[in-house]
Amino acid sequence: MKDVILIANAGSSSLKISIFGIQNKKVKDKIYNIFLEKNNNKILFYINQKQESAISIKDNAIEMMINLFEEWWTKQSALNLIATGHRIVHGGKNFNKPVIVNEKIIKELRVLIPLSPLHQPYNLQVLDLFFQKYKDISHIICFDTSFHYTNPPITKAFGLPKQYYDKGIMRYGFHGLSYQYVSSHFKEITMEDLPTKTIIAHLGSGSSLCAIKNGLSLTSSMGFSVLDGVMMATRTGNLDPGVVLYLINHEKMTMKEITELLYKKSGLLGISGESSDMRTLITNNSHDSKFAVELFVYRIVLEIGKLIAALEGIDCIIFTAGIGQNSAVIREMISGKLSWLGIKIDYGKNQKNEHRISTKGSKVKVFVVPTNEELIIAEEVMKFL
């Protein structure tokens, strides 16, 4: 039998599972890429991008996804599951590194649900189901916030009374697993050392940027929640708190309506009125679509300026995630607005998504490095085995 580990990443309507083979206590290869999603009234089940089945939703969707996976898993007699790894969005103040799951930790993480209400419940539901079904193996949690634990206090504090900071109302930062992968695998991918003062731009449906100094997170664009920072596919990004007060007092909106507005109806979708997909907006000639793209780029450029100030300089910018690693147009637009830094992009290399897309004469190096959150979780799991 072949020893494998399972990596789970759960969303509100989907579940991604990666099965990695291991050899000599190292992650060897990805054997299966499994994706389950809720689509209308059905759950669709994909293995290595091929649809295997579709079943009607009769009960809790996440539980049905796990059961559907387990039904398939029982037929994989050649594979021996020795551990699972799980992405948990929020680790709060106390979880600054991966941990082995037990009942006490699950209870502690449930307390953090108010800090990440749209992600944490589903992360924990999947974790708990695997923990209950596979009692004889280790289950390891990796947190999206842990990478930013090195941020100094000055970067974490809001201008609120200290009592709120003590209660955990502070800047945390997210997408940490992506930043950890890109920074730790940078040399093997690019054949260059990670420059001292680096900004990584994780640009996807959820987007953020991180200032990294000497390989460690210094600060990032996201703060208390995944709403903060740059504008995203359906999220607002930075927003004057007075806007929320106005929506409550004058628009008479409920908390549920405001949550829906800020998380699901804003960003690229809200500005364009057409789509949350950057690929669609780039090819659309409407005024609102163009404005949405321009605003997305503008907010990113402003954030890069803030992070350069925090770093007290800049040596390198790295683009990653769905938009960052695939959209030559967005990279060119951002780099163009940063030309005052002495950034020069090689048009041909940028179009081909090559790893280094800046010219030799560019004063700031610019790279494209695909992220791999599942692999970094798998590598963390192996440290416990």
Curated annotation (Swiss-Prot):
Site residues (Transition state stabilizer), renumbered to this chain: 175, 235
Keyword check for Cytoplasm: yes
The entry's keywords: ATP-binding, Cytoplasm, Kinase, Magnesium, Metal-binding, Nucleotide-binding, Transferase
Broad EC category: transferase
GO biological process: acetate metabolic process; acetyl-CoA biosynthetic process
Cofactor entry: Mg(2+); Mn(2+)
Pfam families to which the protein is assigned, alphabetical: Acetate_kinase
Biochemical pathway: Metabolic intermediate biosynthesis; acetyl-CoA biosynthesis; acetyl-CoA from acetate: step 1/2
InterPro entries: Ac/propionate_kinase, Aliphatic_acid_kin_short-chain, Aliphatic_acid_kinase_CS, ATPase_NBD
Localization of this protein: Cytoplasm
Catalytic activity, as annotated: acetate + ATP = acetyl phosphate + ADP
Binding residue positions for ATP: 16, 202-206, 277-279
GO annotation, cellular component aspect: cytoplasm
Cofactor: how and how many bound: Mg(2+). Can also accept Mn(2+).
Residues at the active site: 144 (proton donor/acceptor)
Origin superkingdom: Bacteria
Gene Ontology terms for molecular function: acetate kinase activity; ATP binding; magnesium ion binding
Role this protein plays: Catalyzes the formation of acetyl phosphate from acetate and ATP. Can also catalyze the reverse reaction.
NCBIfam families from the UniProt entry: ackA
Family: Belongs to the acetokinase family.
Subunit structure: Homodimer.
UniProt protein name: Acetate kinase
Gene: ackA
